[in-house]
Amino acid sequence: MVYIHFPNNLTEEEQMLQAKYQKLKKKKKALQAHKAPKPEPESSLTLKRPTDARDAREVARKLIKSGAIPAIQKQTKQDQTSFKRPKGQERAKRSTSETTVASYQPFSSTQNDVAQETIISEIIKEEPRRQNLYQHFATERDREERGMPEKVPMDTAQPEKPRAGNTIFVSGNKVTEDFLKKTFNDYGTIVNVSMEIEKSRGFVSFAKPESADRAIAEIHGKNVNGINLQVQLARRQPQIEPINDASSSAVWSSIAASKSQKGSHKDHREMVQYDEDFLL
């Protein structure tokens, strides 16, 4: 068997380790004590003895008699009613006062001359209105008795008629008179072609407005021979007389021949004759 002999005295290394261990142990205890929550000290509640109402009254009376405290004065009715009126009620009061019509009160002591003048001026203003109303109703009744139709108000908005005309406005790059004649010859009889060469635009006048409408609908915004054409109805339409219109001369001459100058109106009244004695 082998016996191990431990010396009683510690070596220098062991003593150094033991001292470090003791230091760490102290630090650990101090850290735990710092982290632990500290119990808050109980606050001592000071209980006040409630005073009796009778005792308070007696103390107040004694102080008033001695002159240390002034007595409380009662408020009068005027002080109680003097409150600030809200702004909303003031506005409502103003509006009602403005809308009310002044009326004459002969037995009122507060009636003044200004109110009377305003009433008289209002009565004077009302008189022409009443006369106009009377005239209006009188004329309406008279029209009903005669059986005349009611007047149609002129203010009624009538729908605007669509624009129509024989002349169209054509614009495009390098547009010429021959080009316009060739392009629009298929849509109807061309009466006149006028050009503005500097601005590359022109005006084409057809014999009928239907030809102008068809040309606008089919050619506006399209490319013809590499030229983008903008076709619109011209603002100013020159007056063009219809060509080869059969109803222009023959029809109107027949109508004029069938009607006499006196017209077809016959007078159905009877002739009234008076005696000579009645006239004298």
Swiss-Prot record:
Ranges annotated as biased composition (Basic residues): 25-36
Chain segments carrying region Disordered: 25-112, 141-166
Keywords: Chromosome, Nucleus, Repressor, RNA-binding, Transcription, Transcription regulation
Listed SUPFAM superfamilies: RNA-binding domain, RBD
Comp. bias intervals (Polar residues): 73-83, 97-112
Domain annotation RRM: ranges: 166-236
GO CC terms, sorted: chromosome; NELF complex; nucleus; transcription elongation factor complex; transcription repressor complex
Gene3D superfamilies registered for this protein in UniProt: 3.30.70.330
Single GO term (MF): RNA binding
Disulfide bonds: none
Biological processes annotated in GO: negative regulation of DNA-templated transcription, elongation; negative regulation of transcription by RNA polymerase II; negative regulation of transcription elongation by RNA polymerase II; positive regulation of transcription by RNA polymerase II
PANTHER family listed in its UniProt record: NEGATIVE ELONGATION FACTOR E (PTHR17250:SF0)
Function: Essential component of the NELF complex, a complex that negatively regulates the elongation of transcription by RNA polymerase II by RNA polymerase II. The NELF complex, which acts via an association with the DSIF complex, causes transcriptional pausing.
SUBUNIT field: Component of the NELF complex, which is at least composed of TH1/Nelf-D and Nelf-E.
Protein name as it appears in the record: Negative elongation factor E
